[in-house]
Amino acid sequence: MTLSQQLSTLISKTQLVVSQEQIDLLIQYVELLNKWNKAYNLTSVRDPSEMLVKHIMDSLMVGEVLIGKNFIDVGTGPGLPGIPLAILYPERNFVLLDSLGKRITFLRQVVFQLKLSNVTPVKARVEEYQGEEPFDGVLSRAFSSLNDMVSWCKHLITTEQGRFFALKGQYPQDEISQLPENITLVDSHEIIVPDLVGERHVIVLKKLH
């Protein structure tokens, strides 16, 4: 099976609506990631078929819980979950933030080749970055704890509607119980990723103003 056929099969196991054009873009992204990974070491996942499950599907399944139009993906690495989500939701805007130059160089190439007008890669440390507009959501699968995420990113959420969307494995009960008093749990969603072994959750948090 081609990568495109593999991805189509994975998507068919979900409720996602993805066009052939979007599948083509997602495959182009995987091919670029696989090519650049050999020199830049952007991900520990080496097999493109495995990338479809662990990177593409894992990112796409987050989309159904997002609310809003403007998002920032903090510690995006090679563009995860930001690039797959930007392909799936062209009407939404994504800032992809990372402090490592080689990752941003790669992401600029992805944006150029895939003509993604709704993606802005930014090289910066999160604590030093100020967005031009308020974000509806801060996304991340990079932080080791929820406390770290809200501590480092709290200045990026400035509106009542703003939310933190944290991608985690098992339900992080201990981390939730250790959150500061001004951060509240809005929701948690168990995400079923086709062919992925292990639990996945999206934890939705907000600041109490």
Swiss-Prot record:
Transmembrane segments: none annotated. Pfam families: GidB. The keyword Transport does not apply. It is found in: Cytoplasm. Its EC number is 2.1.1.170. S-adenosyl-L-methionine binds at G75, L80, V126, E127, R141. GO terms for cellular component: cytosol. Disulfide bonds: none annotated. It catalyses: guanosine(527) in 16S rRNA + S-adenosyl-L-methionine = N(7)-methylguanosine(527) in 16S rRNA + S-adenosyl-L-homocysteine. Its main location: cytoplasm. Keywords: Cytoplasm, Methyltransferase, rRNA processing, S-adenosyl-L-methionine, Transferase. It is an enzyme of class 2 (transferase). GO terms for molecular function: rRNA (guanine-N7-)-methyltransferase activity. Belongs to the methyltransferase superfamily. RNA methyltransferase RsmG family. Specifically methylates the N7 position of guanine in position 527 of 16S rRNA. HAMAP family: 16SrRNA_methyltr_G. This is Ribosomal RNA small subunit methyltransferase G. The gene is rsmG.
